[in-house]
Amino acid sequence: MTREIICSALVQTAAVLSLAACAHAQQASPDAMARATEDLENWRKGRVRIYMDDFGELKRYRAANAKLKPPAAGEKRVVFFGDSITDMWPFATAFPGKPYVNRGISGQTTSQMLVRFRNDVIALAPKVVVILAGTNDIAGNTGPMSLEDIEGNVATLVELARAHGIRVVLSSVLPVHNYTVTAMLRFPRRPPEQIAALNKWLKAYAASSGSIYVDYATPMSDDRGLLKKGLAEDGLHPNAAGYAVMTPLAEQAIAKALQGS
């Protein structure tokens, strides 16, 4: 298995066409596929503009961070740090009354997260940080990344947290599926075998670094090893049912991390 992740438009298009013929995937009309492809390409063009203007997207939480008061005495603040899966998590209903801070940014890779880790995590003085990252690195959102590149970035995030007395919950990357039109476009950029390889490393690294590992992938996978269709319409981002699976697992991992804080 190659460990280099290629973000080539030609490779992506060829993979999409082959998946459309897959017996397990939902059949899509040419018009539907064309619209979905155009939407994805427009999204990617928009991301390029963001990368040129503010690579780490430091401005996203600048005002919110400035308004956030230091933790009160005895407060067990937790920062959730990641990409769209964190960004879209409905904290108000999932974690009511908890001192949890959401610092997810859609589309981000670990390279971008390193840029903003001081501002969006360290400066907020949490007891625990929950890191969920890697799927967009595999997809090549900010350029080709080998698994070793992703692992190095994650290790640096963990080392930075531990150097500042912050306990770490390291999350598995969620599986993906190709059961809908939109999902068929996202699927080729996130090969399941690469997600599995990264998760294997994340679990081992969590153990060796004294972090807590939270496994979302296993309970969210179907018998093919893909994300259960009912947990995400687009094959990637959890819906309410998906977050309902994730929330108690996150809470259990945070509780374990706080025991050692």
Task: Outline where the language-model segments fall.
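N-terminal secretory targeting modules
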Residues: 1-79, 87, 91, 124, ...
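Short, basic/glycine-rich phosphate-binding loops at helix/coil junctions
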Residues: 37-48, 94-100, 132-133, 226-227
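Loop/turn elements at helix/coil->beta-strand transitions in domains of secreted/extracellular proteins
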Residues: 75-77, 98-99, 125-129, 163-169, ...
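Oxyanion-hole/transition-state-stabilizing segment in secreted/luminal serine hydrolases
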Residues: 80-81, 86-105, 110-153, 175-180
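Extracytoplasmic/secreted envelope proteins and their assembly/folding machinery
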Residues: 114, 118, 147, 151-158, ...
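Active-site segments of SGNH/GDSL-like serine hydrolases
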Residues: 132-138, 158-195
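Charged, glycine-enriched surface loops/patches
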Residues: 147-171, 201, 205-211
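Catalytic His-Asp segment of secreted/periplasmic serine-dependent ester chemistry enzymes
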Residues: 174-261
